[in-house]
Amino acid sequence: MTIVNDLLNQMPGLGQPQRKFLATLFVTILVLRGRVNFRTLSRYCDYSERTLARQFREPFDWPDFHQRVLRTALDPCAALVSAHDASFIPKSGKQTFGLGHFFNGCASRAERGLEIATLAVVDVTRRCAFTLAGAQTPPGEEATQGKPEDTRVDFYAQQLRAPRHRLPPSLTYHCVDGYYAKKQYIDEVAKLDLHVITKLRSDADCVFLYTGPHPKRRGARRKYAGKVNFQDLSRFEDLGTREDEPHLHLYTAVVWHKPLKRRLRLVVLLNRKAPAQPRFIALGSTDPELNGHRLIDLYGARFQIEFLFRDSKQFTGLLDCQARAAAALDFHFNASLAPLNLVRAEDLGMQQGQEPHVFSMASWQQCQFNERLLDLFMEHLALDPTWVKNHACYEKLRAYGAIAA
């Protein structure tokens, strides 16, 4: 990866030993085979287990580093949205910081372990997500910082508030799943001058807004025109079907959401693939002027954050943390997400102008491993690196075993 050293050199207050360690760490994570823990890392680099454990406790400004990668990779004029989600990390023991019961989507129930909450920026056109901030969710009372009136949702809101100034200036929409469709979270996002796009409950308590003439009588003007019934969509505007999915019918209306106490652009996707049993989902946005089709496209881009969790768990060792202290855990989680940002940024530069954007983390990791192995051959066999890298078979050997996306 050619951009690592340039980005680290730009960061103020970063000493040469830590700069060298981070550059080595990112490359080592991509080339190693096995679990990403201190022992395995020590087998693939010149640092001992003790040195690795000590460096993982050193402070580092991860949001600043992630932001610098974003500036390198993303076009500020492109369509961008932010996404916020959490992922469960299984962990045993008694002394690990943050152990608690968190929801595990794979098991569809709460289990004992850790949770990492991630704020990402998504390029809507190229369907590519980049981590901006990752933090461990404290369990129980620690998540509320001792304030009984606070909840875990307030912790997520605080995680969004802190790096708000690092989001691209052109970004105006924040996409989250249905868990975050709560008043305290939506209000916090609105204070940050962002519009929320989220999934709503199938029985969301919404009412139509009254737009007719007001009779001349005493009293307040009429505001509402009846409760929304998702089984009867005759009062919604019919937007037709999706071009790529003709079985999906779209209906939209501007409604008042009673629990959130605000106007929403409501879009209902009706799935008529099985005409006898049609199914629907409801999406909402705090921007009433947002086009219904555009709302669907922006919300669909939110799922790119799931690929960050998937790739970091499969390839960069998000689940393999050997540490127990809070600082070391935070370092490990961000160190697992950072190589994904770097690889995606370099891949976007190589595929500049190509549509659609094709990316395979498995191929990148295989190529990095092959390149490292070839470098070791050249070093220990006293081969001329210039001659080897200019050989016609070098790229073939470097891409040996790569998996196409």
Where are these regions (language model features)?
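Short, basic interhelical loop/turn and adjoining N-cap
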Residues: 16, 43-55
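Single, function-defining residue in the core of a domain
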Residues: 1-9, 15-18, 27, 32, ...
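Active-site-proximal, Lys/Arg-enriched surface segment
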Residues: 57-133, 138, 250-256
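Residues within the helices of the helix-turn-helix
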Residues: 39
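Short linear loop/turn motifs
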Residues: 53-58, 327
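Hydrophobic, well-ordered secondary-structure segments
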Residues: 51-54, 64-76, 153-161, 171
